[in-house]
Amino acid sequence: MSTQKKTINFLQEFSIPLILGVLIALVWANLAPENYHHFVHNEIIGHISLHFFVNDIFMVFFFAMAAIEITQSLLPGGSLNPLKRAINPLMATLGGVLGPALVFLGLNALIGSPEFARGWGIPTATDIALAWLVARVVFGAQHAAVSFLLLLAIVDDGIGLMIIAFFYPDPANPVAPLWLLLTVAGMLVAYLLRRKNVQSYWPYIILGGILSWAGLYLAHIHPALALVFIVPFLPHPPREEFGLFEDDPQDHSTLKTFEHEWKIFVDFGLLLFGLTNAGVEFSEINTLTWLVLIALVGGKTIGIFLMGSLATVIGFPFPKGMGYKELLVAGVIAAMGLTVALFVSGVAFIDPGLQGAAKMGALFSAVAAVIAFALGKVLGIKKVKDTQA
């Protein structure tokens, strides 16, 4: 492998572009806030600002990557097929969504404000890439907890997509469901392309994707979800032989080609996402910040641990190699909600001050990585090394 390829892999694996974008945004917004906000919200082409381009167009491809992972997991041989083998992590996922939402709403009722209540969806998110990275450091690459956590994060993202679509329409523009017929038309186009055995992904993206995007946009549902409805129609193998983040050299399907050719664009494009969404002034920290942080680190950990434990009690055991200690640490790792949590913060609140406060709570959730590492040491978690290394 060339030095250039190794460098690119390192940057992708450790989410360096996203982290770099977040750091630049934080420094810029606190040193020159007016200049930063002008850069982000100033119209660059017609009425399109950089913020709109990143959140409403670029993020279409980010959520498409998540949809690919979900699609692969549902194939025979994938981690969600057959469903029975995934019951324990699926129940843990349910706890990881309900736990933080309930903690957020409960704490908000005690110490918060009614205007904060819309933020309940923010702490339900788990960052797939960061969770995978930290899990490999804490457990080792081949530990069962890594696959458990990946499955949890993927389904969590799927639920997150539904939360964004159904609970966070633009309050200034009520949902106009009739326009969703365009999205249905986009799905029909993708289905017909699949029936005609069209192998290039471009017709699916250009014809089906644009129709889907237009339908969501005109219906006032976030258009970043457009390709989520198209990806499952891309031709793919009849079964999933390799795990997530693993390349099958024999897989030249349309689904795999689309992922392979766009993933590097998405991974490095997250620098722009971090730059345009994480520019929060520290002066905006308030009670909402701590509600998001506590709901993420506390609510998600407790929810995952309780529901994963309940699944074991009622007859759906942990994956081989996992126990209660590993479940607890996995719950802490899942509390990192950076990417999707930042995104939901932007659609949950109109007030820039509330957006900033919520985003700061999402950023602070990175502390979960430190907690997970320390907890793993205290509990004596044994790392499972990569046998292929």
From Swiss-Prot:
The chain crosses the membrane at residues 8-28, 48-68, 91-111, 119-139, 173-193, 214-234, 262-282, 288-308, 327-347, 361-381. It is a multi-pass membrane protein. Keywords: Antiport, Cell membrane, Ion transport, Membrane, Sodium, Sodium transport, Transmembrane, Transmembrane helix, Transport. GO terms for biological process: regulation of pH. GO terms for molecular function: sodium:proton antiporter activity. GO terms for cellular component: plasma membrane. Pfam families: Na_H_antiport_1. It is found in: Cell membrane. It catalyses: Na(+)(in) + 2 H(+)(out) = Na(+)(out) + 2 H(+)(in). InterPro entries: Na/H_antiporter_dom_sf, NhaA. Na(+)/H(+) antiporter that extrudes sodium in exchange for external protons. Belongs to the NhaA Na(+)/H(+) (TC 2.A.33) antiporter family. PANTHER family: NA(+)_H(+) ANTIPORTER NHAA, SODIUM ION/PROTON ANTIPORTER NHAA-RELATED. This is Na(+)/H(+) antiporter NhaA.
